[in-house]
Design a protein with these regions (language model features):
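Second-shell loop/turn segments in exported
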Residues: 1-3, 58-67, 83-88, 100-108, ...
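Structural recognition of the beta-strand scaffold that forms the well-ordered cores
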Residues: 2-6, 52-53, 131-134
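A short linear-motif detector with a strong N-terminal bias
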Residues: 2-4, 31-33, 109-114
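A general secondary-structure junction signal
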Residues: 8, 28, 134-136
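Flexible, polar/acidic helix-loop-strand segments at domain edges
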Residues: 11-100
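C-terminal solvent-exposed extensions
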Residues: 45, 106-169
Length: 169
């Protein structure tokens, strides 16, 4: 790991507000939490509800954390697309984002690295698509009411090789 960037709960609203509202189509219905949304119905994520939407899960379902992860990945794809679009229009946008949250994050990334990473993304000629990968495996209800995830060891090993290993000739 070359760098790390851990976002505190307090950073979600400023980051969301900076890119503007994002409309998502939830993959499940959540009604009993601090935020309510319905499966298949458009839901607008704002600074006020971003953290709650990303945190919410149906605690009665064994697959609750997997469904939440799917929502989080969908959100991250839409968020990054908006952030990249804003960066193409304003090259200082990534630094502005960084400055909004630098006091509420844990990171070893500085402004120089933010600028470098943004320039790497903008070098792409076509639309930039960030890849998100998910570890294959099985989720079961464990002791008590906790869900337990067991990765497919072979698939995990192959994924690590695909992502981090390149054969030199």
């Amino acid at each position: 790991v070359n760098s790390y960037f851990v976002i505190d709960d307090d950073s979600m609203a400023p980051l969301q507000n900076a890119v503007g509202d994002i409309t998502v189509i939830p993959n499940e219905t959540i009604e009993k939490q601090e935020v309510e949304f319905n499966k298949g119905e458009p839901f607008v994520i704002t600074g006020k509800n971003a953290y709650k939407y990303l945190k919410a899960r149906n605690e009665t379902s064994t697959n609750a954390s997997l469904l939440r992860l799917e929502r989080q990945i969908d959100y991250l794809k839409k968020y990054s697309a908006k952030a990249i679009s804003k960066t193409k229009n304003d090259l200082s946008f990534p630094v502005k984002l960084y400055n909004k949250v630098v006091n509420n994050v844990t990171t070893d990334i500085n402004v120089s690295k933010v600028t470098f990473l943004a320039s790497c993304i903008l070098k792409e000629k076509e639309n930039v698509n960030l890849d998100f990968v998910q570890i294959k495996g099985e989720q079961i209800k464990g002791e008590g009411s906790y869900a337990e995830f067991y990765p497919d060891e072979t698939a995990l090993f192959e994924m690590v090789l695909d992502i981090f290993y390149s054969e030199t000739v």
